[in-house]
Amino acid sequence: MLDERSVPEESKDEGADENHEHKGEEFGQGVLSLTGVYNTANHLYNNNIFFSNIISMPPKRLPVSGSEPKFTQVMWGRAIGINNNNCYAYAVGDYEKKRSYKSVPGERAGLNTSGSSYLSCKVLPKMVVADNPKKVYISNAEEKCKPGYYKVMMFLSPGVRTYFKQGDFHFYKQHSVVEYKAKKGNTYEEIANFFKVPLARVKKAGGTASPRPGKILKFKCNVFSHKRGWATGPLLTDAKGNVIIDPRKASKDYGRLNYNKYCSSFCVKNRGIKVGHTHPKVGKKTG
């Protein structure tokens, strides 16, 4: 609801006619405007389109294949998972208990992974595919991945070409089912509104009159998640705390790093992906 104090009242001077010669024209324009409003309203009514439906329309979600990994904090949200798996490893599902340094696109393929390559959307997508050539292919955001694959998006924070700030990449992955751990004070309405899903779906997942703190609610939900390097567990929210429906429209500004450059979308096989230095290089018997 708008704060009435933020809406200035129109003064008599501001609302008065400054040029009486244009009164007739304004009246004619008003008649045309009213006619247009009537025609629009008549069209909406005849087609069973109501204002309440328009303002409550759910956000457009990108298609899913049905092979998306479930969103969960299990493993990834624990200390070992947080400290050894960055956004790239998380997005492609390559969980490791110990890594000496963060996974970089192209590293497993033996390609040049110097910092300057992080500034090029022409280079990075090819490096991602090269790491798992038989299990990753370039797609587009609106395309449904084939069965057994799910969507991943990559963005860049361009940065400045210096030794200390070379830009950075960031990945998001799609889910069709989420696990949510109910917190004290949560209501089903609050959870449903946050995820933008039907209330009945969340209530069914809860199974009780109100959410029991600590209970894991599992329900269908088409969203994206990400992981901020080795600093966080899996996140369903963007830089402004909103659930991520489409990463391209989400806030990605984290101050020093602003991942505002959409680079590419991929379809990733939902098992068997390996990235980084902890695995054998891609060869005839790998991929």
Segments from the language model and where they lie:
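Extracellular LysM carbohydrate-binding repeats and other cell-envelope/extracellular binding modules
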Residues: 178-181, 190-221
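...with weaker cross-activation on analogous glycine-rich loops/strands in unrelated enzymes
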Residues: 116-177, 221-231
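Active-site or metal-binding loop neighborhoods of secreted/extracellular toxin and effector enzymes
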Residues: 213-287
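Short gly/acidic/polar-rich coil/turn motifs that serve as flexible hinges in modular proteins
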Residues: 183-185
